[in-house]
Amino acid sequence: MYFMAEDYATLGHYDKASALLHSLNEAYRKGGQAVNPVFEAYEDVYSKLSKCGTFSVERPNNNVSVPLLTHTGNRKNPEMMFIMANINGQEVKCTYDSGAGINVMTTKFAERIKATVIQTKNIQMLGMSYADSKGLVVVDSLKLGDLVYRNLPFFVVDMRTDNPLANKKLEELGYECVIGTQTMMPLDEICFDFDRMQLVIPASYTPTPTYAPNFYHSPQRLYHLSLTDGRSGRKIDAIVDTGASGTILTNRYYKKNENCFTGRMATDSLRTAGVGSVNVVKTIPVSWTFTLAGEQYTETNIPVIRSSEQNEEYDCRIGLPTLMAHRKFIINFKNMWMRFED
């Protein structure tokens, strides 16, 4: 029922999504079981969104192309990738983030567009750490080139941390809005053309190729696909994250493969700043190979997370340097496949 509710929400049918989640939550209560707080929170969110106008996408009959920008101007070490959008008449640099299950704007930007913040049950969001939403904003319009979203929801978050260096970096990045997977799913297909540095939204989707791996959309609204791990020889679960500055093997991967790291010490620390705080983890640097759709890929130096408080539900996060090493990266939502093109 949760996935049916999410399907309704993706299409903008928030009343139906809320009703389904209400039925699910009531069934838990009547059965004497604890209600999943995520289900309960989204029942409240969708109920309130149903009163804010219908979500819709207006698109032309032609391809839409939007320039892609990186923070460094270097595809090998991009740090962050952005697109320029227009939200309620205000130009803003946004992260176009396949690793974000929701759309997010800073409290500062919400004030800038004079948005009305709707209070909802608390939603915890996983960036580099957990942070609580300050509420919900529904924007009248978000424009990407000739593409227009209407009545699009954003969660409002104070991204500042208690670390001055992290705050300085966030200010440098100009981190004001995150456009997440909710905006991608209704488009049928998107193409990251890294050679031309453009996000292309084609007028018609590509027929399914013979070698493209399938992926699924998780309850956390992330895009998961299966890889063959060159170290263990087993299938592992990866997410594709266009908002991630690097590729990592998670603490879950480490725990499942500790025997592969016998005698290896966590010699490095990885310090990351994200939504609301700073996180420091111990890492082991490794060279790593994986196979996807019959093609083998090698990462010469990526971190394995030796310790973490985040309890990731995946083994690997594929970030920007890995993705941008290819000419193109296509995500097809019509038939749920991904493909690199070289």
Give the location of each predicted region.
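Pepsin/retropepsin-fold aspartyl endopeptidases
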Residues: 1-342
